[in-house]
Amino acid sequence: MKRVLSNVLKAWIFTIVAFHNFSTSVTADAPVNAAEYNALCRLYNIARAGEGLKEEDWLPCAGKAACEKTAASIEDVFMKLNFSEPSAVVTTLDGTRVELQNSASTRIKRAKLAKVLAAAETIKAQQLKYHESSKSLLESAKANFTKAIVGGWGNPTTPDESGLPTTFKTNRADDCKLAGGNGGKSLVFDIACLCTTSDSASGSKYTCGPKSGDNGSGWLDNNGDNQGKPAAKEAWKNLRADCRRQSAGVRVTPELISQSLVIFEGLIGTRAASGHDNARYIFGTVATAQSCGHSTATNKGSIDYKASNAQQRGDIEWEKNLRMAEGDLRGLLTAKQLVAALQARAEHLEDAAFTIFNESVLETQIAWESSRPPSTDANTSQKGPLQRPEKSGESSHLPSGSSHGTKAIRSILHVALLM
């Protein structure tokens, strides 16, 4: 409960600070739409970074082999004891060669190891399942990020046209709106709508952030289909590099996506569009005579995010895509946590397997030492096939002596098999 409250508090603090940063970064000389431009560019850069997410950072195993490693180690230990002849020479973990007997005790330990191995194989199968499903989640997230940028129009080889509609409406007012228009379909197009100033070629401008200039043509100055495309294309071509600098180098997380969308949504229907002919808000919502069609160069751009006389923020397509990407990333983080828990159980089983194997080695050593005639000269006494380390831990996974005990070994195995 404390952790949940802490996360909620952190999210609110981040949002408050972010709003403060947005407000303080918009100076008196900045365009009236600077806050909206910064919000869209931030989301655009998050989506761009999301397109490049790497498997090694997001998949629960750093490669399929990592999910299989522990089970393979246990299988190797099992195979050392899996012999049917009267005896077999095995190599211990510290490199010593020992002749193990296929005794009743060895067969019992082999049966225990078989159970440990079966449990490890079950865990491996679960890990691989999460690994494969995570690959699908990652691809889904990256696809959603791309669609947020370019919409359903694809990603043409010409960068200036990437994210712009393949078919424009008859005028800017119809294009730059959510209901029945192209508004809300891609971040690129919404930035172009926000930053172009008028329908007419006479003084048609792009104005956002520190950048402004002549579009060369207006939304209505090209006969035939797609007459708004040149103006939108020119605006995006001139703003693209600046927009990418706004939040360059962002590290994508589900929390960052959510918090940045909160900032964006907080600007809808709240900031007046001063100097507009028809628009009440820069990011419009339900309002009387809200329209983003303009006729003079002094008017600023806007986007009409209303739909059918009802507030429909959830119908912004690129926002839906970012929300889906956020969900994909949360699923990836959950999978990583689950696989980490499974890995801890697998390593516990691995410890149990090593303990069982080392017990067999020690039994062989004790039997060998017991069968030797007593030596009268300590300096000439022969040593057995396996030397006990003088201190615990000097030999990898090898207990320091019989004090490790069958009781302790059974306890470890019992706990491992219950996991």
Curated annotation (Swiss-Prot):
One of its GO terms (cellular component) is plasma membrane. Residues 372-384 have a biased composition (Polar residues). A lipid is attached at S400 (GPI-anchor amidated serine). Residues 1-28 form the signal peptide. Glycans are attached at N82, N358, N379. It is found in: Cell membrane. Its main location: membrane. VSG forms a coat on the surface of the parasite. The trypanosome evades the immune response of the host by expressing a series of antigenically distinct VSGs from an estimated 1000 VSG genes. This is Variant surface glycoprotein YnAT 1.1. The lineage of its organism: Eukaryota, Discoba, Euglenozoa, Kinetoplastea, Metakinetoplastina.
